[in-house]
Amino acid sequence: MLSLRDVTREHDFEPLRVEGRVPDELAGTLYRNGPGLFSSFGYRYQHWFDGDGLVSAVRFGGGRALGAVRLLETAGLREERRRKKAYFGAYGTAPPGFFNPVRMIRAMRGDTKSPANTNLVSWSGRLLALCEIGKPFELHPEDLRSIGETDLGGVIPRAFSAHPHRVAASGCIHNIGLRFGRPNALDVFVLRPDGTAGSVATIPLDFPTMIHDFALTERALVVLVAPVRLALLPTLLGRRSFSENLRWEPERGTEVMVIPLDAPASPIRFHVDPFWTWHIGNAFDDGGEIVMDMVRYRDFPTTNDWITAMTHGGPFTDSDGLLGRARVDTKKKKLSFEAVRDKTGEFPRVAPSVDARENRVVYWTEHYDASVGRSGPPDTLVRVDMRTGARDEHRCPPGQFPSEAVLAPRSDREDDGWLVSLVYDSSTDESHFAVFDAARLADGPLARAYLGQHVPLSFHGAWVPASR
């Protein structure tokens, strides 16, 4: 795909050309994270997930927009620059060259390259870039300059997922991380509003796997362990990419693991029919059940092949991710799912006021029809009423592709504020930040702030309101 190539320019915050009018009340910064480099010294990365991390940002205030773009100077990127050659493998890219025993030993210790390219979390005045295969990478929120990898004071032994979730009532951020080998385990973490972090539990897993996201309510985490088994030895030997070593074993079923916040070492565990999910938008307690708004896939190979095809411009299989509501009944040990949308898409988000609370609204990106799903990423931003299925949507012009839409709230109401999305326009090879009234998506953008360059399609982001 045209967008998925190396970024050509980095810069600090500078004024952006604005079309339309930026609302005077909109004040704060949207930080976006995604891949920025797709090769290392001529060695081409084979997957969207593999690119070295790039943070792009837009800062609104006083009706103006400033933009910045910076690569993350991770340890892996710096090492390859010192070596003047590619050295590490990645999710969809096998390590270059032949078997390398030093590289294998380093991989066994968890010493591999994390591109830090997936998400960002703002916590206690700090800005952390995240990727699930490594520790957080800190950067300066003022100018995006790299600080470096952090284990948060010795809290994180191996990895820290790229999808932390927050409890609005407490302000605590919870997350997970995987360990491979002896033991295969799931670490559970908490980031507290006072700036302290802790490891609260380590839970054994039956096999090495990949867990991309989880759900969080005010009382529990819900971790869905799909039957995706990692072939560990060939991964360590570097014979194939991480993705090529993932095996779909549906006979295992998907394990549902409910981890109480007040007793994290005593999870409730049971199995249901196999399925896969990349992203869970929100979850909440509903009497004796847990409700999760999520994008559900029938299996892992189909969606993994679709994403790989997007990296190479096709050919595409049918995308099958549907947004819906899942209900977990821990007493009956059952999980049910009801689709709310019949079109495919990704990147569900909710208003921060309802994090881990009952929500009615989900924002996500959607394929306008099946032909779009067979040709590339979503082209439509949608606000969905999860109770009724009612929707409000904006379809981008042909050749434009929006990123995950993030709400900059004006109040605690779920649709009161502005949706901001980083949009790539293939007709001009330029990216811009589009601002929408969250309650009136069909009216189109209130403003577009142009970066004057292309930014590769990104994954996730964080809105940080301006200090008052």
PLM regions: where:
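Beta-propeller domains
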Residues: 1-468
